[in-house]
Amino acid sequence: MFITFEGIDGSGKSTQIKLLARYLEKRGKRVILKREPGGTETGEKIRKLLLKEEMTPKAELFLFLASRNLLVMEIKRYLSEGYVVLLDRYTDSSVAYQGFGRNLGKEIVEKLNDFATDSLVPDLTFYIDVDVETALNRKGELNRFEKREFLERVREGYLVLAKEHPERIVVLDGKRSIEEIHRDVVREVERRWKLDV
């Protein structure tokens, strides 16, 4: 089982992924929790570079793809060993952030992601949707990925992806309480995989 969580910073996705990991572990599942960019030793170095350096949108995209390619090799291994892999961001982030936010184009970013991941698609993606104002209020400070207009384009990208892939992407209202969102996450996971309770 390969599950990803998506959303703009301040949406609550990192909280929800940790809650789901705890829930699954209590039910005897072996869980691996990873994040993007990062998730591997080299990926974490790339993450530091991405978060502190100004660069062109294309250079940024290629660094994300390099990090993702390394991580996918690990994810495939964990999946083959029967682990549940939970990932904080994946290909949908690149499409939303670089394709829409940085205006590189949805199609080219999707093709490059497909190549970098050997076409590995999550079984399920939770997109936690919040308006930009709410997300910025939760975060408090802005980094270069968080300018208001940019985040509006990113959010639009996520919503486009959710409409295109309703069988995979479940949209959750991120303005609700942590507990309410967690209940919906658990309900969807149980619906799809009939977990032993």
From Swiss-Prot:
Keywords: ATP-binding, Kinase, Nucleotide biosynthesis, Nucleotide-binding, Transferase. GO terms for cellular component: cytosol. ATP binds at residues 7-14. Its EC number is 2.7.4.9. Disulfide bonds: none annotated. GO terms for molecular function: ATP binding; dTMP kinase activity. InterPro entries: P-loop_NTPase (IPR027417), Thymidylate_kin-like_dom (IPR039430), Thymidylate_kin_CS (IPR018095), Thymidylate_kinase (IPR018094). It catalyses: dTMP + ATP = dTDP + ADP. It is an enzyme of class 2 (transferase). SUPFAM superfamilies: P-loop containing nucleoside triphosphate hydrolases. One of its GO terms (biological process) is dUDP biosynthetic process. The keyword Nucleotide-binding applies. Phosphorylation of dTMP to form dTDP in both de novo and salvage pathways of dTTP synthesis. Belongs to the thymidylate kinase family. This is Thymidylate kinase. The gene is tmk.
